[in-house]
A protein has these predicted regions:
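Phosphate-group recognition and catalysis centered on beta-loop-alpha active-site segments
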Residues: 1-395, 406
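Low-complexity intrinsically disordered segments
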Residues: 395-401
Length: 410
């Protein structure tokens, strides 16, 4: 299948790596995101009992993202798993030292019944459109520093999110929120990473204001928006406060940026939220494509609930976001989908690979194209999913353009 004829794109952001199929926030997941052409890759940052920084989506998710409850460390969890109790466990990074966390195996973010055994709880519940295939070799929980090393080695850029603490701050009475925010930035400084390569994020906007006021990493700091109202009364005051404090980028979930319009060619149009943000000079990043199972319903698709959607509508959404809204980039659980789109429409590509070949150029390709994408920074392997999604599209000009890039090499 396709390899060197696609290139990475900074429009394509690896959400927790490539966590549709790889255990989130593992080096394996980050490597998979790089192979799929994510130009920017995310580490969600939280801290351990000894205030070391590790990559986890939440401070208290170890019970669903690792095997901790089947180990002796279960006893140290904030709420240990007790078989037969019917009580859900809660295991936090701050319950353990870094050395202890490094003994755990990461896994797909899921859980079975709390009424079963510890093994059934740990290894149950993975959605059937995901997979457990890549979790049984015991991938480890990476430190933030390890994520910087791995992501940088793949030629990708960085978007760390400082996770909101689940414990009282200052932690242990001494480790303040500002200490935490500064420590994350310091690890990029120590690694020699230029600020232009980093988009630090937080839902706590005081963190973003801190980076702007106190570090060289504030110019691309991202204010995540979890105020999901679609009314102007909800988002205009937010935009004004961000601008007043020097913020340049806001990041809402993707459904806030589009609305259903049965008269539009792609059946989606730019939302008032997007228009108002841009009117105030804010750039936009959004999240998260490929987070939803078959059917395209629920949270991420609620603003187009009246549209009878097909799987291929993901590409129509991407086109509206890229060319009508004008977003900087989009997080995806499977970056290959976004990378494929970005190559076809020349969106924020990185490198010199040739893309969207003509029929004549495709016919001239060699029968075999072999690239070790895992060890090469600039070669991309997308796999079959983007091509399947094209097949699932409605007939329109977007499908025609994407179809010219379906390189299946025998």
């Amino acid at each position: 299948m396709d390899t060197e004829y696609y290139q990475p794109s900074d429009f394509s952001i690896g959400h927790r790596g490539a966590c549709m199929q790889f255990p989130e926030h593992t080096l394996e997941s980050y490597a998979a995101a790089a192979v799929q052409g994510a130009g920017i890759i995310e580490c969600d940052v939280t801290f351990t009992a000894d205030t070391e920084l590790v990559c986890r989506h939440a401070q208290c998710d170890l019970h669903t993202t690792t095997n901790v409850v089947v180990t002796e460390l279960n006893a140290k969890c904030s709420t240990p798993f007790v078989e037969g109790s019917g009580v859900a466990p809660v295991c936090c990074t701050s319950d353990f030292t870094l050395a202890e966390i490094k003994t755990l195996c990461a896994k797909m973010d899921s859980s079975g019944s709390i009424n079963g055994t510890a093994e059934e709880y740990v290894y149950g519940g993975t959605a059937d459109w995901r997979t457990d295939l890549y979790q049984f070799e015991c991938p480890r929980v990476p430190t933030h520093k390890e994520s910087i090393e791995l992501i940088g080695s793949k030629g990708a850029k960085f978007t760390p999110e400082l996770k909101t603490p689940s414990v009282e701050m200052p932690f242990n009475g001494v480790y303040t929120q500002e200490d935490y925010a500064q420590q994350m930035i310091d690890e990029y400084i120590e690694a020699g990473v230029d600020p232009s390569q980093v988009w630090p994020q937080s839902f706590l906007h005081d963190d973003v204001f801190y980076w702007i006021a106190n570090t060289d990493f504030g110019d691309q700091a991202v204010a995540l928006d979890d105020n999901y109202t679609s009314t102007a009364d909800g988002f205009i005051p937010l935009f004004d406060r961000l601008v007043e404090n020097g913020v340049k980028i806001v990041a809402p979930p993707m459904q806030r940026l589009v609305e259903y319009d049965e008269t539009a060619e792609l059946l989606m149009v730019e939302s008032e939220y997007a228009k108002e943000a841009k009117a105030r000079g804010l750039d936009i990043i959004t999240w998260t494509l490929e987070r939803t199972g078959p059917g395209l319903s629920g949270f991420y698709w609620e603003s187009t609930a009246d549209l009878d959607k097909v799987e291929g509508d993901k590409f129509n959404l991407l086109h509206v976001l890229a060319f009508d809204v004008g977003i900087l980039g989009i997080f995806s659980d499977w970056p290959a989908t976004v990378t494929f789109f970005a190559n076809c429409f020349d969106v924020k590509l990185v490198g010199d690979a040739k893309t969207c070949l003509t029929d004549a150029e495709i016919a001239a390709l060699p029968n075999t194209v072999a690239v070790d994408a895992l060890t090469s920074q600039n070669h991309v392997s997308l796999g079959p999913r983007p091509f399947w999604l094209v097949d699932e599209m409605r007939d329109n000009a977007i499908k025609t353009t994407l179809g010219t890039s379906m390189l299946v090499i025998s």
